[in-house]
Amino acid sequence: MARVTVQDAVEKIGNRFDLVLVAARRARQMQVGGKDPLVPEENDKTTVIALREIEEGLINNQILDVRERQEQQELEAAELQAVTAIAEGRR
């Protein structure tokens, strides 16, 4: 099991409280959302992987916001295409 020094991750995010929020959000993405880790898993839990990603500067709150916004836009575009196809099929 890898040991993560939280201090390095805190320095990347700013404070411990925001670090907890960002790491939990990213870990949840990997567990529930099926998102792939950006660092080698090395048999670590998602929380440790999230902390390693933060420590390496691959993840922060702004990056998570941008990714979620892009995914939401892609989902909405796909839904719009499906609705358009249904509407055109009824004509």
From Swiss-Prot:
GO terms for biological process: DNA-templated transcription. One of its GO terms (cellular component) is DNA-directed RNA polymerase complex. The keyword Cell wall biogenesis/degradation does not apply. GO terms for molecular function: DNA binding; DNA-directed RNA polymerase activity. Its EC number is 2.7.7.6. It comes from the Bacteria. Keywords: DNA-directed RNA polymerase, Nucleotidyltransferase, Transcription, Transferase. The RNAP catalytic core consists of 2 alpha, 1 beta, 1 beta' and 1 omega subunit. When a sigma factor is associated with the core the holoenzyme is formed, which can initiate transcription. Promotes RNA polymerase assembly. Latches the N- and C-terminal regions of the beta' subunit thereby facilitating its interaction with the beta and alpha subunits. This is DNA-directed RNA polymerase subunit omega. It comes from Shigella flexneri. The gene is rpoZ.
